[in-house]
């Protein structure tokens, strides 16, 4: 099920276009008419500037501790390598790796 995101998402970059201090953090691995697959990597102290997400599935290639800020506030989340998640979409959030190890996600978005 695809959902409509609020208007704020129309003014923000998607996760591939968003970066950190002018540098990309995500790389497209595959894209076709049905889906887009990309990997985002965050060394310690590196984050992802404010962006939105369409419907997506995520898989933690390497876990760690991320600080996430969104409409509900700021929290720290520890991801375990091999964990996965699904989201119908995120109007906006920004994250930063506050741990001591690199964090890497594989993201899959249906089109």
Question: Where in the sequence are the language-model features?
Answer:
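A short glycine-rich, His/Asp/Glu-containing loop-to-beta-strand
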Residues: 19-49, 54-58
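Histidine-centered metal-chelating micro-motifs
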Residues: 45-48, 84-96
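Short acidic-glycine-tyrosine-enriched beta hairpin
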Residues: 31, 72-90
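Boundary at the C-terminal end of the N-terminal hydrophobic targeting segment
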Residues: 7-9
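Glycine- and acidic-residue-biased ligand/ion/polar-headgroup-sensing regions
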Residues: 53-72
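Ligand-binding loop in jelly-roll beta-barrel domains
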Residues: 90-111
